Design a protein with these regions (language model features):
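Short alpha-helical hairpin
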Residues: 1-15, 37
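Divalent metal-dependent phosphate-bond-processing catalytic cores, especially two-metal-ion Mg2+/Mn2+ enzymes
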Residues: 17-50, 63, 112, 116-215
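An active-site-proximal "capping" alpha-helix that borders the catalytic cofactor pocket
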Residues: 32-37, 73-87
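Short helix-terminating capping/connector loops at secondary-structure junctions
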Residues: 47-53, 92-94
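His-Asp-centered metal-binding catalytic motifs of divalent-metal-dependent phosphohydrolases/nucleases
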Residues: 52-73, 77, 98-107, 131
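Hydrophobic, well-structured mid-protein blocks that either form specific transmembrane helices
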Residues: 81-117
Length: 215
């Protein structure tokens, strides 16, 4: 079996096994892979050596949440990732995929900074930024909070709004983007997110006149 469909099946299986909700499951893996491709395609002409790292970038983008501490023990998740990659990619490629997916989360970066990955440093940033770009989808944040707070849609909106104000809308201010493509695309998605947030606020307040969200 070709690696891409096998990895997508792996994401499906792992998401079911660990009750990973749709905000971090197959749809998210597909979006991060798409974003990684866009960043890579707009960066490789400046750094041709990235061509040889394309499998690492794309694979890490697909499986990055299959060791997420929110859903499982990270070490166990990485072991499962390695099982699927053994005999498909080389030892060095698998090693750097492990390093990328275990150090790219927002919380890890804020706590420990960027890791030093040598010649794979830019590959790391491409995958990390691909995930950051996907975070601008306010609907996805709503879905995550609906599944994980279990407090209803309005509270999910409040929690998602707080997350965006304190984290997502600060990506540029916090200097989390390295590549020029992500800096530009991030600004576009920033304004899309603001529009999305305001639209949901209007829908919630107008759908049921007995409720009103004060922000």
């Amino acid at each position: 079996m070709k690696l891409l469909p096998e990895l997508m099946r792996f994401v499906q299986f792992t998401s079911t096994k660990y009750n990973i909700d749709e905000s971090h499951a197959v749809g998210h893996s597909m979006k991060v892979l798409f974003n990684a491709h866009q960043i890579y395609s707009n960066t490789v002409h400046l750094h041709p050596y990235l061509k040889s790292q394309e499998p690492v970038i794309y694979t890490a983008a697909i499986v990055h949440d299959m060791c997420d501490k929110k859903y499982m023990n990270q070490a166990d998740g990485i072991k499962e990732i390695n099982k699927i990659l053994t005999n498909k990619l080389g030892y060095t490629e698998i090693m750097f995929i492990n390093k990328i997916v275990s150090t790219m989360s927002y919380s890890t970066v804020k706590k420990s900074g960027f890791p030093m990955l040598g010649k794979y440093q830019l590959a790391y940033h491409i995958v990390r930024e691909a995930d950051l770009l996907s975070a601008y989808d306010f609907d996805r944040s709503l879905i995550y909070h609906m599944y994980n707070t279990k407090q209803g849609f309005e509270n999910a909106y409040v929690n998602a709004n707080e997350l965006f104000e304190n984290r997502v809308l600060r990506h540029h201010a916090d200097n989390l983007f390295i590549t020029e493509y992500s800096k530009k695309r991030g600004y576009e998605l920033y304004y899309d997110a603001l529009s999305q947030m305001n639209t949901w606020k209007y829908i919630i307040n107008s759908y049921d006149k007995s409720t009103s969200i004060e922000l």
